[in-house]
Amino acid sequence: MATYLIGDVHGCYDELIALLHKVEFTPGKDTLWLTGDLVARGPGSLDVLRYVKSLGDSVRLVLGNHDLHLLAVFAGISRNKPKDRLTPLLEAPDADELLNWLRRQPLLQIDEEKKLVMAHAGITPQWDLKTAKECARDVEAVLSSDSYPFFLDAMYGDMPNNWSPELRGLGRLRFITNAFTRMRFCFPNGQLDMYSKESPEEAPAPLKPWFAIPGPVAEEYSIAFGHWASLEGKGTPEGIYALDTGCCWGGTLTCLRWEDKHYFVQPSNRHKDLGEAAAS
C-alpha cells in the first residue's frame, strides 16, 4: 500500500493517467492525494473530474482556487473564460453530478499517523492545526449547503488579509478561502499579501513565502501544497513539499511517493502540442 501525492492537474488528464501508470497506482490498494486545481487551463478537465470521482475512497483531495472558480461559473456568478477550457465540462450531461460532488470536497486533509497535512496553497503561519481544522469546516459547511452560491459570490476579494478569531461572517469566510487556496507571500507577522506572484527571490521586502515564516503546524507536521508553479518544487524547508510544477504551462506533473519520498515526473504534453502547432 502506497500513498501518492500529485500536484495541480489543471485539466491535464493524459499526463495524470500516464503518471499513475508510471507509478503503478492501484485503486483500492494505494491512496492518491491531490493538491487541488483539478480543472482549468488544460484540455481535459471533464475527464479529470470523472476519473477522480470514480476513485471513491482511494483518493483524498483538496479544493483549489480554480476549482472554486469553476463552481462560481457553474452557479452563474462568474464568467466562463475561454482560456480555462471549461465549456466541455459545463455542457456535459453529468455536469450537475460532478460539480455537486466537487463542492462537497474539503479544503484540508490531515493524516495523523503520517503527520501529514495538505492544503492547496498551504497553511498560514497564523494558525495552529486546531484553528485550521475549524476554519476549513466553516467554509466546507457553506459550500456543501444550498446557500453555496451566496458564498461564492462573496468569496472574491483580498480583504481581510489578517487573521483574527474575532472575524465573522463573509469576511471570515473570505480570509479562510484566501489562506487555503490563494496564499503565497506573507508579511513577517503572517498577514497575507494577495498581490505578489513572483518567485521568492524577486519579491519585495519585507514579504516572505508563507513557509519561510515559522508556524505551529509546520513544527509538528509535514505540509504538502500546490498552487505555486513558479517555485518549480524547489526552495522549501525540510518537511514542506511544493508539488505544483506547472504541467499546464509546459512543465511537468509531479508525484511524491510518501513512504520513501521518491519523486516521479511526467512531462507536459503542451510541448508536443506547441511543436505540432508550429509544424502545421
Swiss-Prot record:
Its EC number is 3.6.1.41. The keyword Kinase does not apply. Keywords: Hydrolase. Pfam families: Metallophos. Coiled coil: none annotated. It catalyses: P(1),P(4)-bis(5'-adenosyl) tetraphosphate + H2O = 2 ADP + 2 H(+). Hydrolyzes diadenosine 5',5'''-P1,P4-tetraphosphate to yield ADP. HAMAP family: ApaH (MF_00199). This is Bis(5'-nucleosyl)-tetraphosphatase, symmetrical. It comes from Escherichia coli O17:K52:H18 (strain UMN026 / ExPEC).
